[in-house]
Amino acid sequence: MTLFEKILAARGLTTRAAREEFLHPNYASVKHDPFLLPDMRKAVDRLKKAHAEGEKIVIYGDYDIDGLSATAILLDAFGKFGFKEVGAFIPNRFVEGYGMTMGAVDKVRNMGADLIVTVDTGSLCHAEIEYASSLGIDTVVTDHHNVAETPPPSVAAVNPKFPGHKYPFRDLCGAGVAFKLVQALQTELAGLPDGYEKWLLDLVALGTVCDIVTLADENRANVYWGLEVLKKQRRPGLKALMSVAGIDPEKVNARHLGFGLGPRMNAAGRLETAQYALDMLTASDRLEALEASEKLEELNIKRRSIQDEIFDEACQQADNMTDDRVLVVNSGNWNHGVIGIVASKLVEKYKKPVFIIGERGDEATGSARSFGDFSAADAVRAADDIIIKGGGHGAAAGVTLATERIDDFRRRVNEFYDSLQLKNQELYLLPRADVEIDDFSEIDEELIDNLAKMEPFGNGNAEPILKITEATVLSVRRMGAEGQHVKLTLRDKNDVALQMLAFNAPEEFFREVGDEVSAWFQPTVNEWQGMKSVEGRLLHVSGV
């Protein structure tokens, strides 16, 4: 077996048919009947009425990339279907906050809405939808988030998380559900012939990758073909944003969406308003697209600077909490839109669960990131009598509490951690190799070309990781303005050498020449001044 075949086998792809299906996703074979989703029939019927009567539709999106992508999908498709009046409302994180709110419903009423179509939100907005109804505004919900025992009082609630339906795949993102609505409308309205909906897959791919849903079944095919659509550069906004981000459209992959386009789009909603990102997605000409993209780039640079400041301040606090098993850091000067990213970076550095809390007068709001067997949501529940509200899931949660109760909250979540008597939690943060190797003989361009066939990478299909079980450190080079990056050259048992690079490397990566080590890495190709070289993206290193 070749190394590539071993990697495929490690992913459970042991037969020729399974490999073929995985490496060449078939859009048609996973284009499941949209009418199997709950309430899709009701949603289509209500939209047909709006179409026939020329009603004003307002698409109510979320300010994250999934919500923005879903909003852009419906704006594009509804235009082609010939809906007479269609607008969009994206809430501001710092004004309306997350989800539907009463104030936001008032703003939508002032836009003249007869019908609200939510995307990526709405399943838990019972009171707000009831309020809209009292104002004479119907609501069609399209969403993918968790649901309550009773559906919202909307005309329709299309969400694969609702029980009792026969749709075969439940892990669609908001953009994916919006796309299913488009597919359903195609069967009943003219304007977007069968097959032409595939030109929307660039937006579906963007939402799917950035919302970190499982890249399997329909999601994998949508992203696979969505990347092909992106390469065609039919959307001026995404073409301009790729240019600003330095992404070659012919080589665009899922990593570029998650780490190139995604952060730039998110910066708008984190610092000012996500409307800038929607303006980019819906730009109709090159100049408009470039202006919107440059605005996103400017905000992203500002976001990075703010993020670095918060991280440094949080580290100063965390350095004085060496005995705490859960880090709870807080300040009145931290931007609420950025603290979630900082929480993730603190977990990486300190290898502990983290709550980062921004104070706003008497009330404070925080984000949590965790790992392993310590559930952030369970920790919030353990402090239920201390907080105002909170929730989430194992890896991430949010919490709102009185500022004066932060110290009590810190004590409570640490007591909760101790009560669990957890062991070896840090092991969950270590990379897990798909295959172990004892030499570098197959680490070449052919392998990297083959690994690219496994794209798109993301949740449920991570980039393959290899572990060299024993190698000798030939050289160590510190890089970067502060020596924060490292380039190791490792030699295998056959005297074959491979360079490995790690950015912002922890101190244990800086080994001594002659050390015998094991290393976890991802093979990559480095292109510099027209020259190609195979190297490794170093993820972890330990003594043999």
Residue ranges and their predicted role:
Residues 73, 150-191, 197-209:
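Short alpha-helices
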Residues 364, 397, 484-488, 532-534:
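Short beta-strand micro-motifs in enzyme catalytic cores
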Residues 405-411, 513-544:
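OB-fold single-stranded nucleic acid-binding module
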Residues 437-498:
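Accessory interdomain/linker segments of ATP-dependent helicases and helicase-like nucleic-acid enzymes
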Residues 493-511:
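Beta-strand/loop nucleic-acid-binding surfaces
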Residues 112, 119-172:
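Histidine/acidic-residue-rich, glycine-tolerant segments that coordinate divalent metal ions
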Residues 329, 487-492, 501, 536-539:
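Short, acidic/hydrophobic/Gly-rich beta-strand patch recurrent on exposed beta strands
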Residues 2-115, 135, 187-411, 418-425, ...:
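Hydrophobic helix-and-loop "lid/oligomerization" segment in the mid-to-C-terminal part
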